Amino acid sequence: MLKRLWMIFGPVLIAGLLVFLLIFFYPTEMHHNLGAEKRSAVATTIDSFKERSQKVRALSDPNVRFVPFFGSSECLRFDGAHPAVLAEKYNRSYRPYLLGQGGAASLNQYFGMQQMLPQLENKQVVYVISPQWFSKNGYDPAAFQQYFNGDQLTSFLKHQSGDQASQYAATRLLQQFPNVAMKDLVQKLASKEELSTADNEMIELLARFNERQASFFGQFSVRGYVNYDKHVAKYLKILPDQFSYQAIEDVVKADAEKNTSNNEMGMENYFYNEQIKKDLKKLKDSQKSFTYLKSPEYNDLQLVLTQFSKSKVNPIFIIPPVNKKWMDYAGLREDMYQQTVQKIRYQLESQGFTNIADFSKDGGEPFFMKDTIHLGWLGWLAFDKAVDPFLSNPTPAPTYHLNERFFSKDWATYDGDVKEFQ
């Protein structure tokens, strides 16, 4: 009987063991390929966002300076003035590596950073903060889980230091992913219990396996590579060969005029037809009760700021506007929006994060927005005028002065004068 079972299952067990050993001992050294790295940088797929190997390979390339552009769905709005297009066309000293997906916000970005801490050390980054992230209930758990994986988990556990940031991150992880793997260890961190030697040895073992698994399977990941042609290459042909903001503006403005012809809100035709037109009447005043002043996202943002401080990262923060015509139609209160922006800015500036490009009042400018909340055309051009000088003239990170009160529920729910917050 045992012999018969072995004849059936033995080859499967041996094959499984061989695969495990292959992955466990697979080398993590990376061979750089500029063409592949450029394609992964603008792929904007879920894989390029949450998996380790592609982004680490690009960000560690000694010959090309890829810069992380953290955000959410705005990364996916391409046109002739998109930063990835301009950097390629005019052969700038850097190339954006786009790290964003619809529904992603600071918590996903924090866990994704754990996979590439050496590549962030002493570097510059671009971080887009959308006030829309700061909803009352914060993240949709399904969206968070979609962009989270085991490699992020073991990277976090491996690098955590038992401080307040680690405790908060563990607590939020349990809220967003109650059945997360290694839940007992995450619960220990959330409870401020010290991990045992055995715990740390297991974390180290699994982290090593996950890192090598990412290296092994990452070499086969080509999904999204074709996006380079439609995201970047097709726009290179329409831009002037000699760099000139005025000449670029003329080109993208003509494109915007052509592609916003079917509505009065200055939105891209396709977006308006697909997302707005059929529900236009129902959307009238649909956002009158929205508020972004009370949200766990403020605490999640503090996680990112803490990581930037630890890694001596020098970021520039971008705060986008809402399409003004859409804001008025949907009833979104501008005073609330500006109060949200002031709260975000206070959290940044009071801790030493002073590189901020605030476009929150520019949503009424022609061709500034692609749709309701995303930059496009002249909005991207304004973005570039702020970001390019920052990245083209690198400076070290300043000295930050972190305030752990920004992890508190008091701050997350505070809607008063920020200068009076204690």
Give the role of each language-model region.
Residues R4-Y26:
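Hydrophobic membrane-insertion alpha-helices, especially the h-region
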Residues L99-Q101, M336, Q342-Q422:
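C-terminal regions of proteins
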Residues G35-A36, F156-D300, N403-Q422:
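Secreted/periplasmic serine-hydrolase-like ester/acetyl group-modifying domain
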Residues E88, L293-N299, L303-F367:
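Extended hydrophobic/aromatic segments used for targeting, binding, or gating
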Residues E74-A165:
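Membrane-embedded segments
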Residues F25-D47:
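Alpha-helical transmembrane signal-anchor/signal-peptide segments
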Residues G71-S72, V128-Q132, Y270-D279, I318-N323, ...:
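Short loop/turn segments at strand-loop or loop-helix junctions that form parts
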